[in-house]
C-alpha cells in the first residue's frame, strides 16, 4: 500500500473520530465546570438534551444544583424548577437563564409561576442564593444555571422533590420569557428527584402522570381524526353520490345515517377528551383549534337532532330543510378536516402520520371526483331518456 493511501486512510479515521467524539461526550459525567467544581450526583435528563448535577447537604437541607441545556433557538432561554405541590409547570419555583440582549452576558432570574400568563421575574416561595448563569460554548451553546436552594421541610421529609425543566426559543416583552413549544418532549420534561442521589448517573422517566397526559393527547387526536376527518367525509360521499342510483335506495340512506352517527359518537368522545386535556393544562390554550372543536360539536349535535324533524319528501318545507342539512353538513366536513390538520400541527407526530392522513383525504377526494363525473353522466342520460319519451294523449 502506498504512503499516500495510508495517509488518506489515517485522515479518514481521524475525521470519523472527531465526528463521533462530540456525540459520545454528551453525558453528565463528562461535563466539567469552572473553578473545578464537582457534584456527587448527575443525571442525563430524558428530555430536551438536558443535564442536572447536584449535591444535597442534609445538615442544612440545602440543594446545590447545576442545570445545563441548549435553548430551543439561539437567543432563547432555559429553566429548571422545583414544584412543591404538583408535577407540572404551574406552581413551580423556577430559575430561568438567558443571554441578556443588551450585552450578551448570561443571567439568571427567578419566577414564581402561579399561571402560564405570569411569566415575569418574581420572588420564590423558598430561599435561593449563589445564583449564576454561564454559557457552555463547548456543549453546543448550552446555558448553565448554578444555584443553592433551601429545600422546604415537607419535601425534606419525603426525600424527593418534583423537578421541572424547560427550554424556549425567545424572550418576550417587558421582561417576560417567551412561550415554549408544546411538543411531547416539552410536556414530558418533569420527574421526581431523589435528594440522596439514589437515581445518580441514570436516565429517569417523566412519571406516570406525564405518560398518561401524552396518551390522552394521542387518543384525542386519533378519535377526532377518525370521526370528523374520515367518517364524516365518507358519510357525505355516500349521501351525495349513492342516492343517484335507484338500486341503492333506501340502502344509501341507512349507510349515510350509520356512518354519520358513528362519526358523531366517536367525535363526542374525542371532544370530551379535549375538554379533559384543557382542564388539566391550565393556561395552555390553542384558541383556534378549541373554537373550531366547539363549533363542530355544536353543529353536529344540531344536525343529529334535526334528523328527528326531517319532513317527508312531499312536504312543502322539505326543500328548505334540505338546504339547511346540506349547508351544515358541508360546514362540518370543511371544519373537521381543517381542525384535524390544526391538531396535527399541535401534536407534531412523526411525518408519516400527517402524510398518511393527507393520503386518506386525497383518496377520498379522488373517489368523490370520479363519482361526480359518473353521477353527472347518469343524471344527464336519465334526463335525455325522459325527454325522448313520447307525450301521451
Swiss-Prot record:
Cofactor: bound how, per the entry note?
A: Binds 2 heme b groups non-covalently.
Cleavable signal peptide: 1-25
Which keywords annotate this record? Electron transport, Heme, Iron, Membrane, Metal-binding, Signal, Transmembrane, Transmembrane helix, Transport
One of this protein's Pfam families, by short name? Cytochrom_B561
This protein's cofactor list reads: heme b
The record's note on its domains: DOMON domain could bind catecholamines and thereby could regulate the cytochrome b561 domain function. DOMON domain could bind one heme b.
List positions binding heme b 1: 220, 289
Primary location class = membrane
GO MF annotations in UniProt: metal ion binding
Please report the stretch or stretches of sequence annotated as the DOMON domain: 48-168
Q: Which GO terms describe its cellular component?
A: plasma membrane; plasmodesma
Q: Where is the Cytochrome b561 domain?
A: 184-380
Q: How does it sit in the membrane?
A: Multi-pass membrane protein
Q: What is known about what this protein does?
A: May act as a catecholamine-responsive trans-membrane electron transporter.
Q: Which PANTHER family does the protein's record reference?
A: CYTOCHROME B561 AND DOMON DOMAIN-CONTAINING PROTEIN
The protein's name: Cytochrome b561 and DOMON domain-containing protein At3g25290
List localization entries.
Answer: Membrane
Q: Where are the transmembrane segments?
A: 219-239, 251-271, 291-311, 327-347, 360-380
* UniProt binding sites for heme b 2: 256, 325
Amino acid at each position: 500500500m502506498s504512503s499516500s493511501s495510508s495517509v488518506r486512510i489515517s485522515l479518514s479515521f481521524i475525521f470519523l473520530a472527531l465526528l463521533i467524539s462530540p456525540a459520545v461526550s454528551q453525558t453528565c459525567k463528562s461535563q466539567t465546570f469552572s473553578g473545578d467544581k464537582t457534584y456527587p450526583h448527575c443525571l442525563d435528563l430524558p428530555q430536551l438534551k438536558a443535564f442536572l448535577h447536584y449535591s444535597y447537604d442534609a445538615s442544612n437541607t440545602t440543594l446545590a444544583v447545576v442545570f445545563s441545556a441548549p435553548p430551543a433557538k439561539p437567543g432563547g432561554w432555559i429553566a429548571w424548577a422545583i414544584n412543591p405541590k404538583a408535577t407540572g409547570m404551574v406552581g413551580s419555583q423556577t430559575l430561568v437563564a438567558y443571554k441578556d440582549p443588551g450585552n450578551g452576558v448570561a443571567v439568571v432570574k427567578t419566577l414564581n409561576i402561579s399561571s402560564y400568563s405570569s411569566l415575569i421575574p418574581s420572588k420564590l416561595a423558598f430561599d435561593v442564593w449563589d445564583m449564576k448563569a454561564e454559557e457552555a460554548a463547548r456543549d453546543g451553546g448550552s446555558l448553565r444555571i448554578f444555584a443553592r436552594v433551601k429545600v422546604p421541610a415537607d419535601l425534606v421529609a419525603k426525600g424527593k422533590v418534583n423537578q421541572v425543566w424547560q427550554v424556549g426559543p425567545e424572550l418576550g416583552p417587558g421582561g417576560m420569557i417567551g412561550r415554549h413549544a408544546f411538543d411531547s418532549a416539552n410536556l414530558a420534561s418533569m420527574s421526581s428527584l431523589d435528594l440522596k442521589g439514589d437515581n445518580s448517573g441514570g436516565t429517569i422517566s417523566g412519571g406516570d402522570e406525564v405518560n398518561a397526559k401524552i396518551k390522552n393527547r394521542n387518543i384525542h387526536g386519533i378519535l377526532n381524526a377518525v370521526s370528523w376527518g374520515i367518517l364524516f367525509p365518507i358519510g357525505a360521499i355516500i349521501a351525495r353520490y349513492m342516492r343517484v342510483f335507484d338500486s341503492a335506495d333506501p340502502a344509501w340512506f341507512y349507510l349515510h345515517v350509520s356512518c354519520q352517527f358513528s362519526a358523531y359518537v366517536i367525535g363526542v368522545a374525542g371532544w370530551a377528551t379535549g375538554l379533559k386535556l384543557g382542564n388539566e393544562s391550565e393556561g395552555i390554550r390553542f384558541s383556534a383549534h378549541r373554537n373550531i372543536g366547539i363549533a363542530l360539536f355544536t353543529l353536529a349535535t344540531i344536525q343529529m337532532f334535526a334528523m328527528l324533524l326531517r319532513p317527508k319528501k312531499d312536504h312543502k318545507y322539505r326543500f328548505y330543510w334540505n338546504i339547511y342539512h346540506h349547508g351544515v353538513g358541508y360546514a362540518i366536513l370543511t371544519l373537521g378536516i381543517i381542525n384535524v390538520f390544526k391538531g396535527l400541527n399541535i401534536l407534531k407526530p412523526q411525518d408519516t402520520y400527517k402524510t398518511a392522513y393527507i393520503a386518506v383525504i386525497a383518496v377520498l377526494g379522488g373517489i368523490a371526483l370520479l363519482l361526480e363525473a359518473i353521477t353527472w353522466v347518469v343524471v344527464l342520460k336519465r334526463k335525455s331518456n325522459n325527454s325522448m319519451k313520447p307525450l301521451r294523449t
